Amino acid sequence: MTNKIIQQLEAEQMSKEIPTFAPGDTIVVQVKVKEGERSRLQAFEGVVIAKRNRGLNSAFTVRKISSGVGVERTFQTYSPQIDSLAVKRRGDVRKAKLYYLRDLSGKAARIKEKLS
């Protein structure tokens, strides 16, 4: 049982509007990147391979192929570093964790699109 004050603080920090997405979906994450004095937005587009729902400690992992090399990045869902999330495509998968995609490449790593 968590303290009421802690619950209230977590609820305030979780007030950000996040679209619903699931493993297999292709999403675009706009990340705030600070370079010296200036700040800019960097888009990271890829397939969600894992999602961890733990309230304020929720996180998700996105995988993309960049210059022929697989790149994975784990984001905290309610992080202030995330500016926005957009779902580009819904994937039709049967597993919650898509770690098997790490071993696949090319056409074998494609995910069917959910129809509906």
Curated annotation (Swiss-Prot):
GO biological process terms on file: translation
Stored PROSITE patterns: RIBOSOMAL_L19 (PS01015)
An example Gene Ontology molecular-function term: structural constituent of ribosome
Coiled coil: none
Keywords: Ribonucleoprotein, Ribosomal protein
Domain of life: Bacteria
Listed GO CC annotations: cytosolic large ribosomal subunit
Alphabetized SUPFAM superfamilies for the sequence: Translation proteins SH3-like domain (SSF50104)
The family this protein is said to belong to: Belongs to the bacterial ribosomal protein bL19 family.
PANTHER family (alphabetical): LARGE RIBOSOMAL SUBUNIT PROTEIN BL19M (PTHR15680:SF9), RIBOSOMAL PROTEIN L19 (PTHR15680)
Function: This protein is located at the 30S-50S ribosomal subunit interface and may play a role in the structure and function of the aminoacyl-tRNA binding site.
Protein name as it appears in the record: Large ribosomal subunit protein bL19
Species of origin: Pseudomonas putida (strain W619)
Higher taxonomy: Bacteria, Pseudomonadati, Pseudomonadota, Gammaproteobacteria, Pseudomonadales
